[in-house]
Curated annotation (Swiss-Prot):
<dbReference type="InterPro" id="IPR006171">
    <property type="entry name" value="TOPRIM_dom"/>
</dbReference>
<dbReference type="Pfam" id="PF01751">
    <property type="entry name" value="Toprim"/>
</dbReference>
<dbReference type="InterPro" id="IPR034144">
    <property type="entry name" value="TOPRIM_TopoIII"/>
</dbReference>
<keyword id="KW-0413">Isomerase</keyword>
<dbReference type="InterPro" id="IPR023405">
    <property type="entry name" value="Topo_IA_core_domain"/>
</dbReference>
<dbReference type="InterPro" id="IPR013825">
    <property type="entry name" value="Topo_IA_cen_sub2"/>
</dbReference>
<dbReference type="GO" id="GO:0006310">
    <property type="term" value="P:DNA recombination"/>
</dbReference>
<feature type="binding site">
    <location>
        <position position="8"/>
    </location>
    <ligand>
        <name>Mg(2+)</name>
    </ligand>
</feature>
<feature type="site" description="Interaction with DNA">
    <location>
        <position position="60"/>
    </location>
</feature>
<dbReference type="Pfam" id="PF01131">
    <property type="entry name" value="Topoisom_bac"/>
</dbReference>
<keyword id="KW-0238">DNA-binding</keyword>
<dbReference type="InterPro" id="IPR003601">
    <property type="entry name" value="Topo_IA_2"/>
</dbReference>
<dbReference type="InterPro" id="IPR013497">
    <property type="entry name" value="Topo_IA_cen"/>
</dbReference>
<feature type="site" description="Interaction with DNA">
    <location>
        <position position="175"/>
    </location>
</feature>
<feature type="binding site">
    <location>
        <position position="104"/>
    </location>
    <ligand>
        <name>Mg(2+)</name>
    </ligand>
</feature>
<dbReference type="InterPro" id="IPR003602">
    <property type="entry name" value="Topo_IA_DNA-bd_dom"/>
</dbReference>
<keyword id="KW-0479">Metal-binding</keyword>
């Protein structure tokens, strides 16, 4: 009798097979003497669509809503049906005695496996592999500590409740809004409050009125001492009066006080913090960062589990620090690593905190030594960010002295603060020295003459627009960006971790861009006209982050066995009735402000112009008609002058490529340039890209080489 291991992806399945020395490869699984490992392809089973409950639901009608199934159904995803049949046959195999779930260790990973097992009707015992990295050592250690599957039943119930609630609310709210206003509109418990967060910031900026204010400083022996102000001076004349009073007067040093301080590195990365830092440093979007992390985790085995919300490690990991450091010797930080390897580490260090680690600890390097030349540029950047933060947290704190000098001139007090570094500590990693040593020796009681008096003009600044990095952080802490009028709700949001999860926020932002509710211009995220109207037409409960925070709090209670999942689902059904009825009874109107005079070639209705991340397209205004046409899109063709990516306008022989520098090429000119560049041949990479993306061959720069390609 053998144990069947169910992994989430083929790559992880192969890693497990390698760690357990399983040699016999078959179609869809790998077998050994004791184990068989098979895999899903992400989800193999999903919630049924409305039309799979009743064919009449294929047509979207307001009268049919709400659609509330008595019992939720699941279906096998047609694209992955072949693999599902393989997994099913293995689960039901008489030679299989038990199932070991080895999907991602978290709520969604549990759902992937349990939906498959439930669909098959599994009755065999279940065990759980729970690991935070897929290195050979981690897998082998994990198999020595397999848990009983029953210990994760509550986790599954929470995942299932989340999935069913999102279906019930999302399907009905979206269909209600779309059919009521005859427009492609989408609602969701996370995406709609996210639009509201961006809208609130946008309003704050639009209504902001800058105000001038003034400060005064005196210069003593080359050092500026600032006037201690009880208020912000908006009238320059007030400071001019003070200037007149102290001019040519003698001052006195009242106090010279030094205070030693220390600062620690920023916490180890969780996913949101890493996505924010990657955007700040490299302008990498959250989705791009997550995908890169997945490669580092699954393919290269260089980092631990990415989808974590924790900034800490568990104290039992203290003995693994040295081997992780040895792995980083392969990087440019090797000199700092050598200094650390000789040290001993204690679980009393600030990075260890069992209470602040739930499913997974912070993202840190594994013990696998990186082959830098095998990493892509993005993978290298993200790995180095993680290694850098890991090392900073192991290094000594930054020690410095804050020297404060208080002075008096007439009836006015002045202050000078200087930071004097004592020990760079973790700052030595990047040599972050921005302060200087105070060379003048001020003494208490010392008299001085003022060399110069200056009045400085300042202006209040509006808050900045969100970018993809800062919006993630705002979703994690929405209570800081929306006026909730109740401290209780702010506490709920803080406790529940905001709206969405570390694993879903990047997808939500991407979806809002794709549905044209948000747009990003020069890194500034703004709400589109469509996004504003979605907020105006939506029931207020769905635009506030409070609701989704309350849901998340209940899901966390379900995970802990402290709340009934069926009660939660019934609450969601009641809520859905309320939302649908509000939409039905609304007398508001939706206005397409981007309607064009171009007729849809399919149904004849006028099309609307929408912005996408890579350009613009025309979409039929009728949500039942799926016709789309590209107006312009960014291509991979580079400008011969400035090397930037060119934008394609139009299609076919009439297409034109334009660059921001002003360079323009017709399709025939582009074809000739690419033929000359490639000698009429096309690379395997370009061929694969064409096959995967199904680009229009008329507007592919390599079309002459591709046109004879048989697919």
């Amino acid at each position: 009798m053998k144990s069947l291991i169910l992994a989430e992806k083929p790559s992880v399945g192969r890693d497990i097979a390698n760690a357990l020395n399983l040699q016999q490869k078959s179609n869809g699984y790998i077998e050994g003497k004791q184990y068989i490992v098979t895999w899903a392809l992400g989800h193999l089973v999903t919630n049924a669509t409305p039309e799979q409950y009743n064919p009449s639901y294929k047509e979207w009608n307001l009268e049919d809503l709400p659609i509330i199934p008595k019992k939720m159904k699941t279906v096998v995803i047609s694209k992955t049906n072949r693999q599902f049949k393989i997994v099913k046959s293995l689960i039901l195999d008489k030679n299989v005695k038990e199932i070991i779930i080895a999907t991602d260790a978290g709520r969604e990973g549990e759902l992937v496996a349990r939906l498959i097992l439930d669909k098959v009707g599994n009755k065999k015992p279940i065990k759980r592999l729970w690991i935070s990295s897929v290195t050979k050592k981690a897998i082998q250690e994990g198999f020595k500590q397999l848990k009983n599957g029953n210990a994760y039943q509550n986790l599954y119930e929470a995942a299932l409740a989340r999935s069913e609630a999102d279906w019930i609310v999302g399907i009905n709210a979206t269909r209600a809004l779309t059919t009521k206003y005859d427009a492609q509109l989408s609602l969701g418990r996370v995406q709609t409050p996210t639009i509201q967060i961006v809208k609130s910031r946008q309003d704050e900026i639009n209504y902001f009125k800058p105000e001038k204010y003034y400060t005064l400083s005196i210069n003593v022996d080359g050092y500026d001492l600032n006037l201690k102000q009880q208020k912000r001076y908006k009238d320059k004349k007030e400071l001019e009066l003070i200037e007149h009073k102290i001019k040519h007067q003698e001052g006195k040093i009242l106090e010279v006080k030094g205070k030693n301080k220390k600062s620690y590195a920023q916490p180890l990365f969780n996913l949101t913090d890493l996505q924010q830092e990657a955007y700040k440093r490299y302008k990498m979007g959250p989705k791009e960062t997550l995908n890169t992390l997945q490669h580092l985790y699954e393919r290269h085995k260089l980092v631990t589990y990415p989808r974590t919300d924790s900034n800490y490690l568990t104290d039992d990991m203290v003995d693994t620090i040295q081997e992780r450091l040895r792995a980083i010797l392969a990087t440019d930080y090797k000199s700092h690593v050598r200094d650390l390897i000789s040290e001993s580490f204690s679980s009393k260090m600030h990075i260890f905190n069992n209470q602040k680690v739930s499913d997974h600890h912070a993202i840190i390097p594994t013990e696998v030594r990186p082959s830098i030349e095998q990493l892509s540029q993005r993978e290298f950047k993200i790995y180095m960010l993680i290694a850098e933060r890991f090392l900073e947290n192991l290094m000594n704190p930054y020690l410095y002295e804050v020297l404060t000098i208080h002075a008096q001139l007439k009836d006015y007090n002045f202050v000078l603060k200087e930071i004097i570094p004592k020990q760079l500590g973790y700052k030595a990693l990047k040599d972050q020295t921005s302060s200087h040593t105070l060379t003048h020796s001020f003494k208490e009681g010392q008299l001085f003459k003022v060399h110069r008096i200056e009045i400085h003009e300042h202006e209040t600044k509006a808050p900045e627009y969100f970018n993809e990095g800062s919006l993630l952080k705002a979703m994690e802490n929405p209570q800081n960006h929306i006026d909730l009028n109740d401290k209780k709700y702010a506490k709920t949001l803080k406790h529940s971790g905001g709206i969405g999860t570390v694993a879903t926020r990047a997808d939500i932002i991407e979806k809002l861009f794709n549905m044209n509710a948000l747009e990003s211009r020069d890194g500034k995220i703004k709400v589109t006209s469509k996004g504003k109207q979605i907020l105006e037409l939506s029931p207020s409960e769905l635009t506030s982050p409070i609701l989704t925070a309350q849901w998340e709090e209940k899901l966390m209670l379900i995970e802990k066995g402290k709340y009934n999942s069926q009660k939660f689902i019934q609450e969601m059904k009641n809520f859905t009735f309320k939302v649908v009825n509000k939409i039905k009874s609304s007398e508001q109107k939706y206005k397409h402000d981007n309607l064009t005079t171009t007729e849809c070639p399919t149904c004849g209705k006028f099309m609307i112009k929408v912005k996408t991340k890579n350009g613009q397209m025309l979409v039929c205004q009728d949500p039942k008609c799926k016709t789309k046409k590209n107006i312009q899109r960014k291509t991979n063709a580079r400008c011969p002058n400035c090397k930037k990516k060119m934008t394609l306008f139009g299609k076919g022989k009439e297409a034109v490529y334009r660059c921001v520098c002003g360079h323009t090429e017709t399709q025939s000119q582009m074809d000739k340039r690419m033929r000359d560049k490639t000698n009429g041949k096309v690379s395997r990479k370009e061929m694969k890209k064409y096959i995967n993306k199904k680009e229009e061959i008329d507007n592919n720069p390599f079309k002459d080489a591709l046109k004879n390609l048989k697919l």
